[in-house]
Amino acid sequence: DDLVGQEHIIDILKGAVAASRTGSDSQEMTHAWVFTGPPGSGRSSAAVAFAQALICPNQGCGACNECQSAATGGHPDVEVIRTEGLSIKVEEIRELLTRVAWAPSMGGWRVVVMEDADRLTESAANALLKAIEEPGTRTVWLLCAPTLQDVLPTIRSRCRHLQLRTPSIE
C-alpha cells in the first residue's frame, strides 16, 4: 500500500517472492538488489516491503508477526541499516557482516536493507562487495540509493537494479 505508482516494481518483486518460494533457478530471484529513485519515490519502503514478503509465511501480508516485526526493525532475520552520519564506515560493515553470517533463525531468508548505500566509504563498499560476491546461503542484500551511479560499479554490476519513479500527484 505504501508503494503508490510503483506497479512495475511491485510486479517484479512479487515474481521474485514467488520464485524464492519454489526454489526456482529463474532470474526472478537474486541475492542482491539495488533500489534507486529520487527522494519520495519509496525506495526504502519498497526494500522493506520486499524483506517482509520474503520472510512472511503469507508472502507479505503486512499483518502477521513476521511482517510487523520486520517493519519495526525487531525481526531477527531482517537487518535495516540507516545512518545518521555522512558516511557508512568499514567498521560498521564488518560488524554487519559478522551479524549476518549466520543462517536465518526464523524464516527462509536473512535480509539486509541498506537505506543509504550511496554513503558507503570506498573501504566499506569494498568490504560489502566481498559479501555480495560470495553471499551467505539464504542471504539477500537490498541496497537503496538515489541513482545507480551513486553505487560502486563493482557492487552495482552484481545486483539487480530496480528504478522507482516519483509518483504523480493524482
Question: Can you say where each PLM-predicted feature lies in the sequence?
Answer:
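Short regulatory helix/loop adjacent to the ATP-binding pocket of P-loop NTPases
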Residues: 127-132, 148-160
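A short beta-strand-to-loop transition that corresponds to the Sensor-1 phosphate-sensing loop
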Residues: 115-116, 143-148, 166-168
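Conserved AAA+ ATPase "SRH/arginine-finger" region at the nucleotide-binding site
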Residues: 82-84, 160-169
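Conserved D-loop-proximal element of ABC-family nucleotide-binding domains
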Residues: 90, 121-123, 153
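Sensor-1/coupling segment of RecA-like P-loop NTPase cores
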Residues: 120, 135-152
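P-loop/Walker A NTP-binding region and its immediately flanking N-terminal helices
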Residues: 1-118, 140
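Conserved catalytic/switch belt of AAA+ P-loop NTPases
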Residues: 101, 126-143
